[in-house]
Amino acid sequence: MSKVCIVTGKRPAVGNNRSHAKNSTRRRFLPNLQTHRFWVESENRFVKLRLSAKGMRIIDKKGIDSVLTDIRANGVKI
């Protein structure tokens, strides 16, 4: 399963760990992904989404129906 938020499009970023001595080692910054079921009243069913914590806040603000239409407009089947 890919580590990509379906709402915001956030994906892992790469960077460096920096020690006190300024040694650098490569690392990945992973998004805060959660799997969450949302009740969609218009479809009378649950929809299971893998999204970041920021994606959940966007759904709280805009509503699940509005976000689902945006996702489906991008060609993702839900």
UniProtKB/Swiss-Prot annotation:
GO terms for cellular component: cytosolic large ribosomal subunit. Keywords: Ribonucleoprotein, Ribosomal protein. InterPro entries: Ribosomal_bL28, Ribosomal_bL28/bL31-like_sf, Ribosomal_bL28_bact-type, Ribosomal_bL28_sf. The keyword Ribonucleoprotein applies. It comes from the Bacteria. One of its GO terms (biological process) is translation. GO terms for molecular function: structural constituent of ribosome. The keyword Glycosyltransferase does not apply. SUPFAM superfamilies: L28p-like (SSF143800). NCBIfam families: L28. Belongs to the bacterial ribosomal protein bL28 family. This is Large ribosomal subunit protein bL28. The lineage of its organism: Bacteria, Pseudomonadati, Pseudomonadota, Gammaproteobacteria, Alteromonadales. The gene is rpmB.
